[in-house]
A protein has these predicted regions:
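Sequence/structural segment immediately N-terminal to covalent heme-attachment motifs in c-type
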Residues: 25-45, 59, 108-111
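C-terminal capping alpha-helices of c-type cytochrome domains
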Residues: 14, 76, 86-111
Length: 111
Protein backbone atom coordinates (compact mmCIF):
# COMPACT_ATOMS: atom_id res chain seq x y z
CA UNK A 1 0.00 0.00 0.00
CA UNK A 2 1.32 3.41 -0.88
CA UNK A 3 1.41 6.42 1.39
CA UNK A 4 -1.28 8.05 -0.74
CA UNK A 5 -3.62 5.07 -0.28
CA UNK A 6 -3.03 5.10 3.47
CA UNK A 7 -3.79 8.83 3.62
CA UNK A 8 -7.00 8.35 1.64
CA UNK A 9 -8.12 5.53 3.93
CA UNK A 10 -7.30 7.57 7.04
CA UNK A 11 -9.26 10.58 5.79
CA UNK A 12 -12.25 8.39 4.87
CA UNK A 13 -12.19 6.68 8.28
CA UNK A 14 -12.04 10.03 10.06
CA UNK A 15 -14.95 11.38 8.00
CA UNK A 16 -17.06 8.32 8.82
CA UNK A 17 -16.24 8.57 12.52
CA UNK A 18 -17.18 12.24 12.62
CA UNK A 19 -20.42 11.60 10.73
CA UNK A 20 -21.36 8.78 13.09
CA UNK A 21 -20.87 11.03 16.11
CA UNK A 22 -22.79 13.95 14.64
CA UNK A 23 -26.15 14.65 16.20
CA UNK A 24 -29.27 15.00 14.12
CA UNK A 25 -30.97 16.81 16.99
CA UNK A 26 -31.60 20.53 17.31
CA UNK A 27 -30.74 22.02 20.70
CA UNK A 28 -33.24 24.91 20.61
CA UNK A 29 -36.11 22.73 19.39
CA UNK A 30 -35.23 20.21 22.11
CA UNK A 31 -35.22 22.93 24.74
CA UNK A 32 -38.69 24.08 23.67
CA UNK A 33 -40.07 20.52 23.63
CA UNK A 34 -38.47 19.76 27.01
CA UNK A 35 -40.16 22.80 28.54
CA UNK A 36 -43.50 21.74 27.02
CA UNK A 37 -43.40 18.00 27.75
CA UNK A 38 -40.71 17.02 30.25
CA UNK A 39 -39.91 19.86 32.65
CA UNK A 40 -42.79 19.28 35.07
CA UNK A 41 -41.23 16.00 36.23
CA UNK A 42 -37.60 16.08 35.11
CA UNK A 43 -36.89 19.78 35.68
CA UNK A 44 -36.34 22.38 33.00
CA UNK A 45 -32.67 21.46 32.60
CA UNK A 46 -33.11 17.74 33.27
CA UNK A 47 -31.87 17.92 36.86
CA UNK A 48 -35.01 16.72 38.63
CA UNK A 49 -35.27 17.57 42.30
CA UNK A 50 -37.76 14.73 42.84
CA UNK A 51 -36.03 11.43 43.71
CA UNK A 52 -38.64 9.36 41.84
CA UNK A 53 -37.89 11.09 38.52
CA UNK A 54 -34.52 10.42 36.91
CA UNK A 55 -32.07 13.13 36.03
CA UNK A 56 -31.75 13.43 32.24
CA UNK A 57 -29.02 16.05 32.05
CA UNK A 58 -25.69 14.88 30.73
CA UNK A 59 -27.03 11.51 29.57
CA UNK A 60 -25.71 10.05 26.33
CA UNK A 61 -27.78 10.98 23.27
CA UNK A 62 -28.10 7.39 22.11
CA UNK A 63 -29.34 6.25 25.52
CA UNK A 64 -31.99 8.99 25.65
CA UNK A 65 -33.10 8.30 22.09
CA UNK A 66 -33.39 4.56 22.69
CA UNK A 67 -35.27 5.02 25.96
CA UNK A 68 -37.81 7.36 24.35
CA UNK A 69 -38.22 5.12 21.29
CA UNK A 70 -38.74 2.11 23.56
CA UNK A 71 -41.32 3.94 25.71
CA UNK A 72 -43.09 5.00 22.52
CA UNK A 73 -43.12 1.48 21.03
CA UNK A 74 -43.98 -0.25 24.30
CA UNK A 75 -40.70 -2.19 24.39
CA UNK A 76 -39.94 -0.41 27.66
CA UNK A 77 -42.89 -0.44 30.05
CA UNK A 78 -43.74 2.57 32.19
CA UNK A 79 -47.29 3.81 32.78
CA UNK A 80 -46.13 7.42 33.08
CA UNK A 81 -43.61 7.59 30.26
CA UNK A 82 -45.50 5.60 27.60
CA UNK A 83 -48.20 8.26 27.08
CA UNK A 84 -45.61 11.04 27.30
CA UNK A 85 -43.49 9.47 24.54
CA UNK A 86 -46.40 8.35 22.34
CA UNK A 87 -46.90 11.67 20.48
CA UNK A 88 -43.17 12.38 20.03
CA UNK A 89 -41.85 12.30 16.48
CA UNK A 90 -38.45 10.88 15.55
CA UNK A 91 -37.19 14.46 15.26
CA UNK A 92 -38.66 15.38 18.68
CA UNK A 93 -36.78 12.46 20.22
CA UNK A 94 -33.50 13.48 18.56
CA UNK A 95 -34.02 17.10 19.64
CA UNK A 96 -34.75 16.14 23.25
CA UNK A 97 -31.70 13.87 23.34
CA UNK A 98 -29.52 16.68 21.98
CA UNK A 99 -30.84 19.17 24.54
CA UNK A 100 -30.55 16.95 27.61
CA UNK A 101 -27.16 15.59 26.56
CA UNK A 102 -25.82 19.16 26.45
CA UNK A 103 -27.03 20.03 29.96
CA UNK A 104 -24.53 19.81 32.80
CA UNK A 105 -25.33 16.89 35.07
CA UNK A 106 -25.91 17.65 38.72
CA UNK A 107 -24.62 15.20 41.27
CA UNK A 108 -27.25 12.96 42.80
CA UNK A 109 -27.41 13.22 46.57
CA UNK A 110 -29.17 11.13 49.18
CA UNK A 111 -31.27 12.83 51.79
Amino acid sequence: MTMRNLSTIAVAALAMALAAGASAGNYEAGKAKAKEVCAACHGEDGNSQVPDYPKLSGQHRDYLEKALRDYKSGARKNPIMAPMAAPLTKQDIENLAEYYHAQPAALATRQ
